[in-house]
Amino acid sequence: RHKMISNFQLEDFELSQAHTFFWDKYEKSNWFLEQVIATADQELTSRKVAFLLQTPQQDGGQWDMVVSLFEKYGVVPKSVYPESISSSNSRELNTYLNKLLRQDAQILRDLIHSGADSEAVASKKQALLQEIFNFLAMSLGLPPREFDFSYRDKDNQFHTESGLTPQSFY
């Protein structure tokens, strides 16, 4: 942020927290589904499975996790992807997302226990992950693939950087 302010001679600048929030929820959901597949041979009452199902995902994380999100999905200005009610107050979103993930866990476990091959399981996981993406997009808005960044510098000169991607902006 400070480097952006300096490089572009801005008065102030904020990166979108909602953009990182979206991809954090998506990646945590993906990780959860991978863990469900990896533990499908264990009973629901096993400590690991019970722990996973208790809270499939939640807010927060560690620095290395957010750096990985930046590297994979990039960043965008807050003006391009602003906060929403769901990103500012995530309790309700987390409640629904965790319910959806638990349902998805049951679907995957049932599929695996029915003898489905790994290709069918992977395909189903991708379909479930697409549903999660759709849920997040409806709740938070669709993250931009490309955007224009317009700003006024400290000298009040107007600038536009066109055709940026979140990765190129990072």
Language model features with spans:
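Catalytic-core signature of thiol
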Residues: 2-170
